[in-house]
């Protein structure tokens, strides 16, 4: 059974921007699976938080976080999904040299 509140620690990934792992503060990151650590990199402590089911979180549901910590020992918050098409447009623009009016007239 998931407790009504839990003191958790939040760690940022050293490999992937906007990826975080939430763990019970008492447990820490020592019990995280090796496969997760390979993907995640060295955990960088962000802060500790007293979490309740009703606590609003930016990109996660508090009850889901608490349940995952209870069941698996951690909750992994993945980076937000970006629109692949727009990222392709931005990358293409960055790789295309600027063309001026004079270049077009030649």
Swiss-Prot record:
Residue ranges occupied by any YcgL domain in the UniProt entry: 6-90
Pfam families noted in UniProt: YcgL (PF05166)
Its domain of life reads Bacteria
PANTHER family associated with the record: PROTEIN YCGL
- Protein known as: YcgL domain-containing protein HCH_02617
């Amino acid at each position: 059974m998931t407790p009504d509140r839990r003191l958790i620690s939040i760690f940022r990934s050293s490999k992937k921007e906007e990826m975080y792992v939430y763990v019970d503060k008492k447990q820490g990151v020592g019990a995280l699976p090796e496969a997760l650590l390979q993907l995640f990199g060295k955990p960088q402590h962000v802060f500790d938080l007293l979490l309740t089911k009703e606590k609003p979180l930016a990109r996660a549901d508090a009850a889901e976080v608490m349940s995952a910590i209870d069941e698996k020992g951690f909750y992994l918050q993945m980076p937000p999904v970006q629109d692949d098409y727009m990222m392709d447009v931005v990358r293409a623009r960055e790789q295309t040299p600027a063309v001026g009016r004079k270049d077009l007239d030649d």
